[in-house]
């Protein structure tokens, strides 16, 4: 079989159509397929003329309604995006130095943000009412937290062993030996550090306790006067003048899962009858060439199967500026003016049509709402780790989310996805300037969501959590190590955000959000320091002689005190704060029905197992987060990788590589404490034995087989598994369908396969006008690529080729027209198997 015949056989057309094509050479085939019979000055440009025909062979249902257009040079191009209507969106530089702002005010250059009143008098009165209520509630939270912390800290002070604080006089130590003075002060310095750390950590735990408690009361009562969801009755027709864009920024994600979830979401929107009010934008920042081609294929299949021409769009940026936030900003600049609202979706997001329509209705009913965040439920994973985390977030999450809403009201969080945003104020106020200066805490903002919410509120718009709106879903990382990879990026981002704590005009609630974001990760090194100082105090007590006399001519010795009954009482009180939210969560489920969680006994057993699991993982996370915080301050680079979205298990080698140092620390710590005092080892046992077991817990919990076994036993069962909503059932069905027809090695197929080359050529974005300089550059790229083996062609050079329709056409022609000359490419491609289901069957294509 000659190469021309082989080329024709690779086309998804009927045998009769193949027989009608010329077998003389490759150029003749492309000329025969070119309905316009164009003449090309170069023979290796001839594939450009057959792009339309080759696309119609493979994806005839995707080319309706003018999907195929001509660029300025007359080349065929897929209309993957609507015409841009640009808006101005530029950030104001950050002024993080309060001294500099004070100097500006002295010079009459006040930079306080200003905004115009947008509400009627009645709306302003309603707005002022909930803001006053929110302020009062937050003062109550502050008083409760601080009072509880003061009492606990004073109690902690009374049970520490060395109580001679008042007898220490620095002047008496001036004339004595330095070592003697140091040994006298050492226990008290350690105790002071312990006490300060205890106060900070207890305050952090106390705030979480009161948040969960108020969330429990909100959910138990079932009525919330200030819930934003109560502002609509739920069935109002959508305003045709207010259109909504569903935007999904993606970067090197699992293409099958992305498009399965997106299709399920769109099908659910269509089922509501409101699809005409929505458009979908897939905003790709992918830089893996194979994934880029797979995304193009998946988009073509999606618009064909759901009839999404003119409503579902795809764009891949060639310049990845500011990562996800830059991708969203780029959408706003080009197409944002065409929409009143946008819903931001993550790659693993799935939302029902009712939820999306509900968010739009809430926006229309609340004209001063800038962002409304839904409360996504975690589901869809099968590993033991993910199922345990799904159960935890499903059981405990509603309490904390409702509690956050209780304290924050319309000055709340935005989590970056599954939320609706009012586009105009977002464009005007939420562009993010890079943080000034140098170092690891300067440059592009990593965790953009909290900052965008703060800027929206600074401009006078409300930020709400619709915690009681159902139909919003997401997925969790499948194992501990993948979760920690994500946490490292979040840790760095939250530490960066704290630089904005003193920025002018930020609402106190969002300053608190920045603070809690930092404490989410800074609490780990603080806890580690607390444990380290406690251990050091025990070492001092065991190995040194107590200093009974701290003053000259002191009549009575100061004896170290050990009051285990008080220590146990304080420990029990702290455990109540930590675990009472879990108990309240299960109590709420017991009151409202346990059937969807597997029944009374199974949900109770699941709770106990989850508590054990969280105890085992807490010290492991503590050490990892400590390393992340230290890394951020030392300026170690954070790699921005997309998290693992599928059920991926951790190997033993990877586990011991990541957890080996923790295992060693746990062993040394345990042996040392056992040698010093077995009683102290009892208190440290949950910490040290969790570290020793960390590699084993990490591996076993990452296994999908173990997770599926617990699912069969109805442990860690959640309502979405007991009675899956249709949108999740559809997601699983579409995911299986996509996996069966998935495309691997997309770049090589885009070079060789007639259909995928036509697709890549039609979707290439570098469509410049012809020039001699450009032709020289194109020839250089093609020659350099073909003169090397495909293995040596790096990612960046592949992306350059993939972005230019002319280079893709020329590559395609040359490897088929001169296989002997480019034998390394041909041999490499012959070793690649094309999934037979990746393209339509010839008999189906001919019907």
Curated annotation (Swiss-Prot):
GO terms for molecular function: hexosyltransferase activity. SUPFAM superfamilies: Nucleotide-diphospho-sugar transferases. It is an enzyme of class 2 (transferase). Pathway: Glycan metabolism; osmoregulated periplasmic glucan (OPG) biosynthesis. Its main location: membrane. The chain crosses the membrane at residues 139-156, 194-216, 512-534, 568-590, 603-625, 680-702. The keyword Transferase applies. GO terms for cellular component: plasma membrane. CDD domains: Glucan_BSP_MdoH. The keyword Glycosyltransferase applies. Involved in the biosynthesis of osmoregulated periplasmic glucans (OPGs). This is Glucans biosynthesis glucosyltransferase H. It comes from Escherichia coli O6:H1 (strain CFT073 / ATCC 700928 / UPEC).
């Amino acid at each position: 079989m000659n190469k021309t015949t082989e080329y024709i056989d690779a086309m998804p057309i009927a045998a009769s159509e193949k027989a009608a094509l010329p077998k003389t050479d490759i150029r003749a085939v492309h000329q025969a397929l070119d309905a316009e019979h164009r003449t090309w000055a170069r023979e290796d440009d001839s594939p450009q003329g057959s792009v339309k025909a080759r696309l119609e062979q493979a994806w005839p249902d995707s080319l309706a309604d003018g999907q195929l257009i001509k660029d300025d040079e007359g080349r065929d191009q897929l209309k993957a995006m609507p015409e841009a209507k640009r808006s101005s969106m530029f950030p104001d530089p950050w002024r993080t130095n309060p001294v500099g702002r004070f100097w500006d005010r002295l010079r009459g250059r006040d930079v306080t943000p200003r905004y115009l009143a947008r509400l009627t008098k009645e709306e302003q009165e309603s707005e002022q009412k909930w803001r006053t209520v929110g302020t009062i509630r937050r003062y109550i939270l502050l008083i409760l937290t601080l009072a509880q912390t003061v009492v606990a800290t004073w109690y902690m002070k009374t049970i520490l062993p060395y109580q001679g604080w008042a007898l220490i006089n620095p002047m008496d130590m001036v004339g004595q030996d330095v070592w003697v003075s140091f040994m006298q002060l050492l226990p008290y310095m350690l105790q002071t550090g312990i006490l300060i750390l205890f106060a900070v950590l207890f305050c952090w735990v106390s705030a979480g306790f009161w948040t969960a408690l108020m969330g429990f009361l909100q959910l138990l009562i079932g009525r919330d006067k200030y819930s934003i969801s109560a502002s609509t009755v739920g069935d109002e027709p959508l305003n045709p003048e207010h259109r909504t864009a569903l935007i999904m920024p993606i970067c090197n994600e699992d293409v099958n899962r992305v498009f399965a979830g997106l299709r399920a979401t769109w099908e659910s929107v269509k089922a509501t009858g409101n699809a005409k009010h929505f458009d979908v934008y897939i905003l790709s920042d992918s830089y893996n060439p194979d994934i880029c081609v797979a995304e193009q294929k998946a988009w073509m299949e999606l618009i064909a199967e759901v009839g999404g021409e003119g409503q579902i769009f795809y764009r891949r940026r060639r310049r990845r500026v500011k990562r996800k936030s830059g991708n969203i900003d780029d959408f706003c600049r080009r197409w944002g003016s065409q929409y009143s609202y946008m819903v931001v979706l993550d790659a693993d997001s799935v939302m029902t049509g009712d939820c999306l329509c509900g968010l739009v209705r809430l926006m229309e009913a609340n004209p001063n709402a800038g962002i409304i965040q839904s409360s996504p439920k975690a589901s869809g994973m099968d590993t033991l780790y993910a199922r345990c985390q799904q159960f935890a977030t499903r059981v405990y999450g509603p309490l904390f989310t409702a509690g956050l809403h209780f304290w924050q009201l319309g000055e709340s969080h935005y989590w970056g996805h599954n939320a609706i945003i009012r586009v105009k104020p977002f464009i005007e106020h939420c562009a993010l300037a890079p943080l000034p200066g140098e170092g690891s805490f300067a440059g592009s903002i990593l965790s953009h969501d909290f900052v965008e919410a703060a800027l929206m509120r600074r401009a006078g718009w409300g930020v709400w959590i619709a915690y009681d709106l159902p139909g919003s879903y997401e997925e969790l990382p499948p194992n501990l190590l993948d979760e920690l990879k994500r946490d490292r990026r979040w840790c760095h981002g939250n530490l960066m955000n704290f630089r904005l704590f003193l920025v002018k005009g930020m609402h106190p609630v969002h300053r608190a959000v920045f603070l809690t974001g930092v404490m989410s990760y800074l609490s780990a090194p603080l806890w580690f320091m607390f444990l380290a100082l406690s251990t050091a105090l025990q070492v001092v007590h065991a190995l040194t002689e107590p200093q009974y006399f701290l003053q000259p001519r002191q009549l009575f010795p100061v004896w170290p005190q050990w009051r285990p009954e008080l220590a146990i009482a304080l420990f029990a009180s702290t455990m109540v704060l930590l675990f009472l939210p879990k108990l309240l969560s299960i109590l709420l489920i017991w009151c409202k029905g346990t059937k969807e969680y597997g029944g009374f006994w199974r949900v109770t057993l699941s709770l106990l197992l989850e508590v054990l699991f969280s105890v085992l993982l807490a010290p492991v996370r503590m050490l990892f987060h400590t390393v992340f915080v230290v890394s951020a301050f030392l300026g170690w680079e954070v790699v921005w990788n997309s998290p693992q979205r599928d059920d991926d298990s951790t190997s033993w080698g990877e586990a011991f590589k990541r957890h080996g140092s923790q295992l060693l620390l746990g062993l040394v710590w345990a042996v040392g404490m056992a040698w010093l005092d077995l009683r102290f080892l009892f208190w440290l046992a949950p910490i040290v034995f969790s570290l020793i077991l960390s590699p084993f817990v990490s591996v076993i919990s990452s296994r999908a087989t173990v997770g599926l076994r617990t699912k069969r036993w109805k442990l860690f069962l959640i309502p979405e598994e007991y009675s899956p909503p249709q949108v999740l059932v559809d997601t699983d069905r579409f995911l299986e369908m996509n996996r069966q027809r998935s495309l691997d090695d997309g770049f090589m197929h885009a070079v060789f396969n007639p259909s995928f080359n036509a697709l890549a050529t039609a979707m290439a974005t570098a469509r410049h006008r012809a020039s001699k300089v450009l032709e020289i550059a194109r020839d250089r790229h093609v020659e350099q690529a073909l003169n090397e083996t495909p293995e040596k062609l790096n990612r960046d050079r592949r992306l350059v080729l993939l972005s230019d329709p002319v280079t893709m056409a020329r590559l395609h022609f040359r490897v088929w027209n001169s296989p002997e000359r480019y034998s390394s490419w041909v041999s490499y491609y012959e070793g690649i198997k094309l999934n037979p289901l990746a393209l339509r069957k010839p008999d189906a294509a001919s019907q």
